[in-house]
Amino acid sequence: MKFLFDLFPVILFFITFKIYGIYAATAVAIGATFAQIGWVWFRHGKVDTMLWVSLVLIVVFGSATLILQDETFIKWKPSVLYWLFAAALLIAQAIFKKNFIRTMMKEQLTLPEPVWARVNASWAAFFAFMGAANLYVAFNYSTETWVNFKLFGFMGLMLVFVVLQGLMLSKYMATDEDKEA
């Protein structure tokens, strides 16, 4: 359910685009992201940094799209977001010796430090790739194709990446039999 909630602005963007076009979809995405943050704040009393970053980007790039009536800006937003994620993962690891992936997953997995570093680097590389893929589709195909890719392509790529990551990490996961021994 959280997965769908996280996709709420993207799904509304997609539906609105199909009916009313890119500018209405952009306005709806801005409003939906504000609503999403309001709901998270109401339910949990705090909002993740990642969601705040997404809000700032959708407001900046979305507003530029609407004010200038130029869809180029909204097409850049996913790439900038993905590249910020990649940079945050790499900078936190290299400079601050903090592995955000380990912080998020340490309750589910116990891994040797070099493996955590590889997992962190693979997520950073994946986000960098996603940013590049977004720009490739955005500026080499129609806006309609880009909107479809933004929802279905990104979800598909994420699913494939998570499955591959799970396969890579499966040898480190303890089975119930291992835990009983």
UniProtKB/Swiss-Prot annotation:
Keyword terms, alphabetized? Cell inner membrane, Cell membrane, Membrane, Transmembrane, Transmembrane helix
Keyword Cell inner membrane set for record: yes
| Entry-linked InterPro entries | YciB (IPR006008)
TM regions (residue ranges): 3-23, 49-69, 76-96, 119-139, 149-169
Topologically, how does it sit relative to the membrane?
A: Multi-pass membrane protein
Q: Where in the cell is it found?
A: Cell inner membrane
Instruction: Give an example GO cellular component term for this record.
Output: plasma membrane
Give a Pfam family name. Answer: IspA
> Where does it primarily localize?
membrane
Q: Does the keyword Ribonucleoprotein apply?
A: no
The UniProt similarity line reads: Belongs to the YciB family.
Functional note: Plays a role in cell envelope biogenesis, maintenance of cell envelope integrity and membrane homeostasis.
- Name of this protein: Inner membrane-spanning protein YciB
Q: Which organism is it from?
A: Nitrosospira multiformis (strain ATCC 25196 / NCIMB 11849 / C 71)
For this protein's source organism, the top of the classification is: Bacteria, Pseudomonadati, Pseudomonadota, Betaproteobacteria, Nitrosomonadales
